[in-house]
Each structure stands twice: as structure tokens, then as C-alpha cells.
Amino acid sequence: MEALLEGMQRNGQGSSGFLTSCEAELQELMKQIDIMVAHKKAEWEGQTQALEACLGVREQELSSARAALEEKHKEVGKLRQQLEDMEAAKQDLVREYEQQLKKFQEELARLRRSYEKLQKKQLREAREEATKRQGDDQCEMSRLSRKLEEFRQKSLDWEKQRLLYQQQVASLEAQRKALAEQSELIQTQLASRKQILESVELASRSEIQHLTSKLERANDTICANELEVERLNMRVDDLTENNRMILEDQQRVAEELRQSKKMLEVLQDEKMELRATLQSQEDFIDSSKLHQEQLQKELARVTETLHTKEILIRALEERLQEKQLSSPGLEHILLQLDVAQEKEQHLQAEVTHLEDSLVSSNARCVQLSEELAESIKELQSMEEHRAESKVEIKKLKEQLSQAEQIHRGELEGMRKEILRLTQELHQRDITIASAGGSTSDLEQRLRMEIERAERKAVEHRMILVQLETLKLENRHLSEMLEKVELGVLEGKDATLRALSEDYVVELNKLKSENQQLKKDLSEAREKLELTTQSQPEGTAQQLQSEEPEPRDVQHRPTQESQHKQDEQTEKIHHKPDKTTQHHQRWKIQPLPAEIPVAVIPEASVLPTQTSRKSCVESPTLAAGALQGTDSLLLVLDDSKGFPDATSRQSNHEQESVPLCPLPTSSVGSVAARYLEEEELRSQHILECLDAHIEELKKESEKIVRHFGHQE
């Protein structure tokens, strides 16, 4: 027990010495904290330099994107120049066609005069031969009148089809106007979006500067917070070390308490055993006392009997002395005396034996009482030691509670600091998330613009498909007309008489159709100018509305698109040259007198109709409006001679086929390829934006994990 008390005192002295030696350790820890602060400061300076380098790289990327935009503007200027060159070439073609029309009108006037002469000659011959061929002429006239009725019926059907086609062309014109209005709206929207993007770019620059300043301030605050966190961490380490030592002392004290409890239990067991032995000894003492009392009573009784016997002996001796009895009586009395003396000796031996046993029992009782007193003293000392140990335990518990309160207070302060730091980090995350949200909004707007452009491209393709179908129908109708012309040429003599009256009307129609063709041609030219002006503006605005992307990503699609556009412009330049060469080969020759002129009106009306249809079908291409004049020239070339009609018709068809689809195929392919390239570029920009957003998310997660580990 004394060793246990000494160990507890030593533990108390060690804990007090540890508390007094904390100041030197705190000074050493402050030195280490200064070293760590300098190290962290160097790290943060390196990180700020890296961020400044990243900002420089981003500015370089912005400058490269601007350079790419300037290159695109230059390409757009080149395309505009090429379109102007094409427009000039088309105007030259129109002038040539107008000259050919003038020649054609002169030929028509000459044909009219020759037709009048031929008509007079035929009337004169008809009067001479009227008597001879009256019957044959009547049959032939009836047959030709039936054919004429059939042809008129077909012409009515063709007129109905022409009206239907005109209605379709009007609907297509309305659609084109609606598309033009939509394109104007889109251009205005693109201009407004361009302004918005410029304002957003300025705002983003100011925001970047503001964020850089915030970042610097945040870096300073983070450095200070890291210093504070390191100081708090060191303090926490000290407190945890103190707490660990206190816990070790507490465990040691608890172990000693357990050992003392075990010793107390052992002592209590010994005390119970001693109490049992004392109880047994007390019972034995009580029994010995009772036996002693009985022995004393027996001794008193024996002494009384001895005393009585002595008295009797004395009385007998006196009697003997007084009465001098006879010898037998004396012997008998002597024998009784001897027996009494033996009994007395025996009783004296028993008395001595009893006295000896009483002395031994008294000695045993004294020994047991001494042992009992010693055990009582030991129990008292153990109780005192237990009380002292309880007092020590209370003191240790109070010290532990005080240390825990101090530790809890320090932990609360650290938690408050950590909460403040986490709130600041959360605010930074919110700013980063807001920046990411603005980028996502821009990305969404860009996607919406790309979807709208795709829809416009799909509508444009549908319109092109409809135009192709209408062209196929026009070709089919032209083939039908040629077949009808061949059928009409078989009955040339009868039709000359029957259609002589309709020739003047159809010629007037032809003039009106030519005037209408000129008007349509001028309208198509104006529309083409409008579309050529709107398309480069739309492409430029679309290029300006796109996000800037890295340098190595932009050069590949721009080079490919430039190469494709160069090839397409070369094709466009080559094709008008071919068409001009092809049209220069055509020469309008005068018709011989044998050609039936009545074929021309019906053959000229329908090609002019088809020319009007083809002109309206492709409002964005001025060359499509010249198909009617080409077909008129083909009819004139076909009417040179009957033996060569089929061969010349096939040759002119082979030569005139590439003239009509030339502008639609070249410019349509250019527009389609340009739209495809713009779609690829928009997809690539979206992928780059997604990758950049993913990198920002990863960096923010790394920062959050880093500060989470520090906490």
C-alpha cells in the first residue's frame, strides 16, 4: 500500500513537471511553424506564378482566336469578290442573251414577212388547185381539224399545268420571302448576339481581372489561414500529446486503482477470515470461560467438600481424642481417612490440572486478543489508505476534467476557425460555379444557334429537293413538247393553214413572255444580290459568335475549309466559262422558206413557261432564269431542217443540259459543304468547351479535397 501511494505521488509530480515544461516546447513549435509558413509562402508564390502563366496562355489563345476571325473575315471578303465576279459574268451572259433575243426578234419579223408572202402564194395556188383537190382537201381539213382540236385540248391541259406550276412557284416565292425575312431576323439576332458577346467578353475580362485580384486576396487570406491552421494544428498536436500523456497517467492511475481494489478485496477477504477466526476464538473463549466457571464451581464445591471433610476429620479426631473407641472402629475410620486423603489428592491433582488449563486458556485468549488488536489496526490503516486513495482519485479526476475542458475550448476555437475557412472556400466554389454557369449558358446559346442553323440547312435542302423535282417535271414537259412538235411537223401543210390566224396572237404572247422574262431576270438578280450580301454577313456573325478555342485546334478545320472553298470557287469560275463558250457556239441562222412557221408559237409558249418556272424555282441563282431563252434557241435550231431534226435535237439537248443545273449544283454544294464545315467546327468547339469545363471541375475538386485533408 505504501508503494502504491509513492507511485501516485510520483505521477502527480511528473504531470505538474510536464505542464511547467510546455513553454519551451511551444517556443520550439513556433520556430517550426515559422519555417513551415515560409515554405508554404514559397509554394503559394509558385502557384500564383503558374496561374499568371495560365492567364497569359489564355490571352494568347484569345489573340490567336482573333487572328483566326480576321482570317475568316478575309476569306469572306474573297468570297464576296468571287461572287461579284460571278455576278459580272452572269451579267455578261444576260447581255449576250439579250442580244440573241434581239436577233431572234429580227428573225421573227423576217419570218413574218416570209410567212405573209408564203401565205399569199399558197392562197393563189390554193385557188388554182381548189377545183382539183377539193375533196382531198376537205378530208385532210377534217383530219387536221380533229388533230387541231386534240392539240388545243392538250394545250388547255398544258395551260392548266402551267397555272398549277405558277401557283406552286408563287407558294415557293412566298416561302422564299418568309425565309428571307427569317434570314434578316437571324442576321439582326446575330448582330445583337455579337454585341452581347462583345459586352460579355468585356465583362469577362473585367471579371477575370476582378477574379485575379480576388484570387490574390484569397491567396493572402489562405496563406494567413494556413499559418493559423498550422499554428492551430501544432497546438492541437501539443494538446493531443498532453491529452495522451494525461490519458496514460489516467490509465496508470486506473491500473493502480484496480490493483488497490484487488488488494482491498484481498484484505477484505483476510478481514472476513480474521473476523471468522476471531468469532471462533471468541466462541472458544466463551466456552473456556464457561468451562472455567464450571471448574471454579467444581473447585469451590470440592474445596467446600474438603473443608467439610477437614472439619469432619477434625471432628473425628476430636471425637477420637475424646472417645477413645475400639481399634476396629479406629481402623475403619483410618481407612475412611486414607480414602478421603486419596480422594483429596485426586481432587487436588484435578484442581492443578484445571488451573493449568485455565492458565493456558488465558494465555491463548491474550494471544488472540493481541492478534485481533493487530488486525484491527491493519484494517484501520487500510481504511485510511483507501480514503487517501479516494482523495487522490478525486484530485486526478478534477485535473482530468479541467484538462478536458481546456481541450474542448481549444477544439471549439479550432472548429470555428475551420468553419470560417470552409465558408470562405465555399464562397470561392460558388464564384467558380457561377463562372461555370455563365460558360454553360454561353454553351447553351451556342448550341441553340447551331440547332437553328441545322434547321435552316435542312429546310434549304428540302427546298433544293423540291426545286430538283420541279426541274425534272419541266424536263419531262419539254420532252412531251418535243414529241408533240414532231407529231405536228408530220402534218405541216394543214397546220399552216389552220394556225395562221393564231400566229399573231402567239407572237404577241411571246413578246409579253419575253418582257416578263426580263422582269423576272432583274428580280432574280436583285434577290441574288440580297442573298449574297446576307450570306457572308451571316457567316461572319456566326464566326464571330463562336467561342475562342485553342490555336492547334482551329488551324486544321480552317485550312480544310479554305482548301475546299478554293476548289469550289475554281469550279464555279470554270463552269461559267464553259457555258459562255457553249453559248458562243450557238448561232442563229435564218430559216429557209420551206420551214413551217406555225410550229413556232406553240413550241415557244411552253418553253417560256418552263423558263419562268425555272427562274422562280431558283431565286438565289440568276442563271436559272435563262433556261427559257435556251429552250427557244433550241427550238429555232431544231427547225432548220426536217431531215436533221432528231440529230440536232439530241445534240442541243446534250449541250443544254449542263447549263440549267450549273449554278444550283455548284453554289448548293458550296453552301452544303460550308454548313457541314460549320457544324463540324461547332461540334469541335462544344467538345473543347466540355473538356475545359471538366478540367475546371477537376481542379475545383482537387482544391476541395486538398483543404478537406488539411481540415
Swiss-Prot record:
List the biased-composition ranges (Basic residues).
Answer: 572-585
**Per its UniProt record, what InterPro entries does this chain match?**
Cep63/Deup1_N (IPR031470)
Spell out the GO cellular component terms annotated for this protein, sorted alphabetically and separated by semicolons: centriole; centrosome; cytoplasm; spindle pole
Biased composition (Basic and acidic residues) is annotated at 548-571
Q: Name one Pfam family in it.
A: CEP63
Query: Where does the protein principally reside?
Result: cytoplasm
Q: Which domain of life is it from?
A: Eukaryota
Q: Which residues form a coiled coil?
A: 23-192, 224-535
Q: Where in the cell is it found?
A: Cytoplasm, Cytoskeleton, Microtubule organizing center, Centrosome, Centriole; Cytoplasm, Cytoskeleton, Microtubule organizing center, Centrosome
Compositional bias, Polar residues, is annotated for 530-545
Keywords (alphabetical) are: Cell cycle, Cell division, Coiled coil, Cytoplasm, Cytoskeleton, DNA damage, Mitosis
Presence of the UniProt keyword DNA damage in the record: yes
Enumerate the residue ranges of region (Disordered): 529-585
Output the GO biological process annotations, alphabetical, semicolon-separated.
cell division; centriole replication; de novo centriole assembly involved in multi-ciliated epithelial cell differentiation; DNA damage checkpoint signaling; signal transduction in response to DNA damage; spindle assembly
Entry's PANTHER family? CENTROSOMAL PROTEIN OF 63 KDA (PTHR18875:SF7), SARCOMA ANTIGEN NY-SAR-24/CYTOSKELETAL PROTEIN SOJO (PTHR18875)
| Function, in words | Required for normal spindle assembly. Plays a key role in mother-centriole-dependent centriole duplication. Plays a role in DNA damage response. Following DNA damage, such as double-strand breaks (DSBs), is removed from centrosomes; this leads to the inactivation of spindle assembly and delay in mitotic progression.
Stated family: Belongs to the CEP63 family.
The protein here is known as: Centrosomal protein of 63 kDa
Highest lineage ranks of the organism? Eukaryota, Metazoa, Chordata, Craniata, Vertebrata
